[in-house]
């Protein structure tokens, strides 16, 4: 797996940080997790071909995690170098079908192309993982919106977890259990509180309790661009800590 943080920012508009988007390139597929504003151009800047996407997964339905699906599909339909015939699978948490129906009711004429585009509604409790040619994808409820979930990818003995937006929760700890890399949000300042988001102390708690070996901090606004890694370390996490920027790449 090669993982690229295409968008490390938040709802706050910033020149240097796009909204949430993570691309996972496997041996045979390109997977995208969330598509916030600026994600499509962010893929280009990171050296990723937006037309190569095979699967899209959403963590929840806030615009800063979903809005660029419209320009992506618009581009695939009208601007691809060759007409697409390859399947594009789009998945999201229950009630994803309702969200998708509303979106396509407005934009469908310009989004839906002449290629297979199945949509998959994931129940909030993962019973059977999504099987791809190269990895298994599990998910679990997170503490942000009623529909919010995070994802866990397992491939070739390595585990990568992406929380999406969340506060502390036992299900989040379980999702991140013994992960090689935990990509985790930090939308609240040290000692502060923003409902549905984590402080550096919360990041450290989840990372420590789960036994994650490495933490990559993402989804933080400009006013939190202090030394987040030092704050997470001071809160008790002893593993490796990285702070994501747009274009940060790593393997689990």
Can you describe what each PLM-predicted range is?
Residues 167-250:
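Cap/insert and terminal regions of metallo-dependent hydrolase folds
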Residues 1-162, 167, 172-174, 229-252:
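Binuclear metal-dependent hydrolase catalytic cores
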């Amino acid at each position: 797996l090669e993982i690229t943080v295409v968008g490390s920012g938040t709802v706050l508009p910033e020149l240097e940080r796009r909204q949430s988007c993570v691309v996972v390139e496997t041996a045979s597929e390109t997977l995208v997790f969330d598509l916030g504003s600026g994600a499509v151009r962010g893929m280009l800047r990171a050296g990723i071909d937006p037309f190569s996407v095979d699967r899209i997964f959403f963590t929840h339905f806030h615009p800063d995690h979903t809005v660029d699906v419209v320009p992506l599909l618009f581009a695939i339909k009208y601007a691809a170098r060759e007409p697409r015939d390859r399947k594009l699978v789009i998945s999201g948490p229950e009630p994803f079908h309702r969200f998708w129906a509303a979106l396509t009711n407005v934009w469908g004429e310009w989004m839906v192309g002449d290629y297979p585009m199945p949509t998959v509604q994931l129940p909030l409790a993962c019973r059977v993982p999504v099987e791809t040619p190269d990895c298994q994808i599990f998910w679990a409820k997170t503490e942000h919106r009623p529909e919010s979930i995070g994802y866990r990818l397992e491939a070739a003995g390595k585990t990568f977890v992406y929380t999406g937006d969340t506060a502390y929760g036992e299900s989040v700890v379980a999702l991140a259990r013994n992960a090689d890399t935990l990509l985790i949000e930090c939308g609240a300042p040290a000692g502060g509180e923003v409902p549905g988001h984590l402080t550096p102390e919360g990041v450290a708690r989840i990372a420590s309790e789960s036994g994650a070996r490495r933490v990559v901090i993402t989804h933080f606004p400009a006013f939190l661009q202090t030394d987040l890694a030092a704050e997470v370390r001071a809160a008790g996490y002893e593993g490796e800590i990285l702070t994501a920027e747009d274009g940060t790449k790593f393997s689990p």
